[in-house]
Structure formats: structure tokens, C-alpha cells
């Protein structure tokens, strides 16, 4: 199956699954077991109907197996895509956090420089504390 091959190429094949079963690698068998019974000339009675029923059920099970395998492969590929998107999002958030930290460090330095320049006067952006994250909370905030 081509989806199985795509899973392998994407590195998403589970090690516990093992190789694709031979019954799913090959096309479904052609023909009808009833034809072989009729050509042999043997009279099997109810066994023929039972064999035909078993043959049909095996065909139905094979179709369901193929459908389920296709769905499993689709889900695996979708999970791989989602995993890549998650990694990208996490990397972007990490970069944003790093930029914010650098900006905060830059603002802290600016506050120190402004405080020195104003000689004790409080600037508009600076609270007088060179490290805004370490300032005491407002009284109203603590109530």
C-alpha cells in the first residue's frame, strides 16, 4: 500500500506494527472457490455453500482491513504534520520569549540610564527602580 510506504518515509511507522501483512500487500485473489468445486465434478452438498459463505466473509474482512489500514496511515501522516506544526509553534514562542527578555533587559538598562540622567527625578516610563519586575506591588493590587 502506498500509504504504508508514506508512513515509512515520514518515519512514523510504529516499531510494534512490523511489516505490512502479505495479505494486504497483494491484490485480492481472483476467481471463486465454487468454480473449482464445480469443475472437479465432486458433489459436496452443503459444504459448497459454506465454502462460498466463508470466501465472501474473508473478502469482506479483507476490505475492512484495507479500509482500517488506510485510516491508520492517514491518521499517522496527519499526526506527523501536527507534530511538525507544534514544533514550529514552540520554536516561535521560544524566540518570542527570548526577544521579550532582551527587551526587558534593554528597558531596565534604559531606566538606569534615565535615572542617572534625571538625577533622582522619576521618568515617565521608569518607576525609579532599574528592574521593573522587582518593584513592590501597588497597595490597591494587594487588597
From Swiss-Prot:
<feature type="compositionally biased region" description="Acidic residues">
    <location>
        <begin position="90"/>
        <end position="106"/>
    </location>
</feature>
<feature type="compositionally biased region" description="Basic and acidic residues">
    <location>
        <begin position="107"/>
        <end position="116"/>
    </location>
</feature>
<dbReference type="InterPro" id="IPR029202">
    <property type="entry name" value="DUF4530"/>
</dbReference>
<protein>
    <recommendedName>
        <fullName>Glutamate-rich protein 4</fullName>
    </recommendedName>
</protein>
<feature type="region of interest" description="Disordered">
    <location>
        <begin position="90"/>
        <end position="143"/>
    </location>
</feature>
<dbReference type="Pfam" id="PF15039">
    <property type="entry name" value="DUF4530"/>
</dbReference>
Amino acid at each position: 500500500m502506498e500509504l504504508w510506504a508514506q508512513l515509512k518515509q515520514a518515519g512514523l511507522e510504529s516499531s510494534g506494527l512490523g511489516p505490512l501483512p502479505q495479505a494486504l500487500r497483494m491484490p485480492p485473489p481472483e476467481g471463486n472457490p465454487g468454480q473449482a468445486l464445480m469443475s472437479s465434478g465432486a458433489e459436496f452438498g452443503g459444504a459448497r455453500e459454506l465454502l462460498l459463505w466463508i470466501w465472501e466473509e474473508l473478502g469482506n474482512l479483507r476490505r475492512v482491513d484495507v479500509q482500517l489500514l488506510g485510516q491508520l496511515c492517514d491518521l499517522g501522516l496527519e499526526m506527523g504534520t501536527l507534530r511538525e506544526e507544534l514544533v514550529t509553534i514552540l520554536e516561535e514562542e521560544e524566540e518570542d520569549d527570548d526577544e521579550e527578555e532582551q527587551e526587558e533587559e534593554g528597558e531596565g538598562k534604559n531606566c538606569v540610564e534615565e535615572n542617572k540622567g534625571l538625577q533622582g527625578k522619576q521618568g515617565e516610563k521608569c518607576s525609579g527602580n532599574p528592574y521593573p519586575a522587582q518593584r513592590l506591588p501597588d497597595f490597591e493590587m494587594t487588597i
